[in-house]
C-alpha cells in the first residue's frame, strides 16, 4: 500500500482491488473468444455510469453508437478482420470532433454538433476502436486542472480531493480508474504529460504532426498535438500507431514510424542528461523535494540499465516563453471563433483572448520565425546526450478546487509554480513521454518526462519500456472510491 494517514490517496499492488486489465489483455481475450466487444463496451459503459457522479471524467457518453459499433466489431472479427484495435473501448478528449456530437472544449453553452469525424477519430474507428465517449477538459485546454461551470470538477482516481491535472484530465481519470484502457488527449503545454504524471500513467506527446489535427491544418499555431494516455508503454504505443498518419492538408507531416516495434527492444547504451533547471517564465517555481528524489531514483534506474546519466540542462534562453505565449494565446483566439457566440467563457479565458488578439499578427509571425533558432539552441544539448530526463511537474497534484477563485494573474502564477517544465517541447514540436516515477509520502503520483529530439518516439518508447520492466509501475492502481 502506498499512502499516508490523513489522506484518502493510495495505491494497491497486485491484491485487494480487482486487477485492471490492460489493452493488450483485452486484445488477447477478444482474439481467443473469451469475451466479445459488446461485453467489453457494456462493461466500460457501466463503469462510466457508476463513476460519473463522483469522478466526472466524461462530458459526453456515446452509449447508443458505442453499442452499435461493438456489435459491428464482433461481426468484423467473426468474418476474419484483424484490425489492430478491433472491439476495444477507447475515450477521446472533448476537443476532437465526433460526428453528430458537439465539441464544447470545456466551455458552457451551445455548440453545434460536428458534421464529420476528425481524422484521429476516423483512424481509430478504422482500426476497430469503439469510441465510448468524450472526456472532460478545462476551457480551451488552457490550464493543468479539469474543471469549469459547464461540467463541474473532474477528480483524481488516486485522491478524490485532488485534480487529475489538465487539460486532458478527463482522459487521464478515465484510464487511471479503469473505465477504459487508453484514451486520446492533446498536449499544448503539457496537457497529456501533466495529468499522466498526476495519475500514474504513460502519457505520450508525439512529434508535431504525428497524429493529424485535421480538420485543423495545425492546432494552436503548431504548439498543440494529439497524443495518448495508457497504463503501459505497450498499450500507449499500440494506440499511437493506430491514431498516427496524415491527410494532404496537414501542415506538419513527419516521416512515418511504427512505434510499437520499439517496445521490448533495447535502445542501446544511451547518454542521458538529468535536468532540474526550469525554463524562464517570469514566475518562480520550486521543485518539490520528493519529486526531485523520484527523478534522481529514475536516473539511478537508468544507470543500472546500462545508460550513462549526467547532470545537464537545455539552453532555453529568455525569449522562449514569449514565443510560446504568442503562439498559444493567438491559437485561443482562433478556437473561440470556431466555437461561436453562444458559449459563456471564463473571465480568465476572456483575458487570454484579448492578449491573443494583440499578439496574433506581427508578434506571432516573429515567434514563428524564431522556431528554427529556438530548435538549434535548445537542441544543442543533443550534440552531447541522447535524451533529457526531467521532472514532469514541480509539485504534486493540487486540490480540485485550488484554482476556482483565482484571477488571471493568480492562475498563471499557480500553474507555473506547479508545472513549469513541459511547455518548451510543445514550442519545439519534439516528442516527450511521461512515465510514472513513484508516489509522494501522501500517496500522490509523481511522473518524470523523457524528452528527445525530432522524430525520436521510437527511442523514447524503448527507453520507457525498459523503465516499466524494472519498476513494475503497471501493477499499482488506485483504491476504488468512485463507485460509492
Swiss-Prot record:
Active-site residues annotated for this sequence: 93, 167, 191
A GO molecular-function descriptor: amidase activity
Keywords: Hydrolase
SUPFAM superfamilies named in the record: Amidase signature (AS) enzymes
Keyword Hydrolase: yes
EC number(s) given by UniProt: 3.5.1.4
Broad enzyme group: hydrolase
Reaction(s) catalysed (UniProt annotation): a monocarboxylic acid amide + H2O = a monocarboxylate + NH4(+)
Similarity field: Belongs to the amidase family.
Name of the protein in question: Putative amidase AmiA2
Organism in which the protein naturally occurs: Mycobacterium bovis (strain ATCC BAA-935 / AF2122/97)
Amino acid at each position: 500500500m502506498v499512502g499516508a494517514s490523513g489522506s484518502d490517496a493510495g495505491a494497491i499492488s497486485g491484491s485487494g482491488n480487482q486487477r485492471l486489465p490492460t489493452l493488450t489483455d483485452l486484445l488477447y481475450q477478444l482474439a481467443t473468444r473469451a469475451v466479445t466487444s459488446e461485453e467489453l463496451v457494456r462493461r466500460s459503459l457501466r463503469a462510466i455510469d457508476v463513476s460519473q457522479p463522483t469522478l466526472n471524467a466524461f462530458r459526453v457518453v456515446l452509449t447508443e453508437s458505442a453499442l452499435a459499433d461493438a456489435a459491428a466489431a464482433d461481426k468484423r472479427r467473426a468474418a476474419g478482420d484483424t484490425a489492430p484495435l478491433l472491439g476495444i473501448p477507447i475515450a477521446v478528449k472533448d476537443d476532437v470532433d465526433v460526428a453528430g456530437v458537439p465539441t464544447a472544449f470545456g466551455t458552457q453553452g451551445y455548440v453545434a454538433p460536428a458534421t464529420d469525424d476528425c481524422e484521429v477519430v476516423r483512424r481509430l474507428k478504422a482500426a476497430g476502436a469503439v469510441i465510448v465517449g468524450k472526456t472532460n477538459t478545462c476551457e480551451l485546454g488552457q490550464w493543468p486542472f479539469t474543471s469549469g461551470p459547464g461540467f463541474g470538477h473532474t477528480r483524481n482516481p488516486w485522491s478524490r480531493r485532488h485534480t487529475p491535472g489538465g487539460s486532458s484530465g478527463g482522459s487521464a481519470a478515465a484510464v487511471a480508474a479503469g473505465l477504459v484502457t487508453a484514451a486520446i488527449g492533446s498536449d499544448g503545454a503539457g496537457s497529456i504529460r501533466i495529468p499522466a504524471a498526476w495519475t500514474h500513467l504513460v502519457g505520450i506527446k508525439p512529434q508535431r504532426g504525428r497524429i493529424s489535427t485535421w480538420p485543423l491544418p495545425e492546432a494552436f499555431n503548431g504548439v498543440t498535438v494529439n497524443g495518448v494516455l495508457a497504463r503501459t508503454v505497450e498499450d500507449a504505443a499500440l494506440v499511437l500507431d493506430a491514431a498516427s498518419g496524415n491527410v494532404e492538408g496537414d501542415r506538419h507531416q513527419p516521416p512515418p514510424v511504427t512505434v510499437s516495434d520499439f517496445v521490448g527492444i533495447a535502445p542501446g547504451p544511451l547518454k542521458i542528461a538529468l535536468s532540474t533547471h526550469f525554463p524562464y517564465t517570469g514566475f518562480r517555481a520550486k521543485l518539490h523535494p520528493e519529486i526531485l528524489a523520484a527523478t534522481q531514483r529514475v536516473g539511478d534506474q537508468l544507470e543500472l540499465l546500462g545508460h550513462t546519466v549526467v547532470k545537464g540542462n537545455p539552453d532555453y534562453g529568455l525569449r522562449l516563453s514569449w514565443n510560446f505565449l504568442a503562439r498559444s494565446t493567438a491559437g485561443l483566439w482562433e478556437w473561440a471563433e470556431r466555437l461561436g457566440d453562444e458559449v459563456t467563457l471564463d473571465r480568465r479565458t476572456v483575458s487570454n483572448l484579448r492578449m491573443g488578439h494583440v499578439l496574433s499578427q506581427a508578434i506571432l509571425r516573429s515567434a514563428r520565425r524564431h522556431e528554427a533558432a529556438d530548435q538549434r539552441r535548445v537542441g544543442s544539448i543533443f550534440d552531447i546526450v541522447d535524451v533529457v530526463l526531467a521532472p514532469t511537474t514541480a509539485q504534486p497534484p493540487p486540490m480540485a478546487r485550488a484554482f476556482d477563485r483565482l484571477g488571471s494573474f493568480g492562475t498563471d502564477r499557480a500553474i507555473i509554480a506547479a508545472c513549469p517544465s513541459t511547455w518548451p517541447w510543445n514550442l519545439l514540436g519534439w516528442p516527450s513521454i511521461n512515465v510514472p516515477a513513484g508516489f509522494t509520502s501522501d500517496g500522490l503520483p509523481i511522473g518524470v518526462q523523457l524528452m528527445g529530439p525530432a522524430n525520436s518516439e521510437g527511442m523514447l518508447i524503448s527507453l520507457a519500456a525498459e523503465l516499466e520492466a524494472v519498476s513494475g509501475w503497471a501493477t499499482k492502481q488506485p483504491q476504488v472510491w468512485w463507485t460509492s
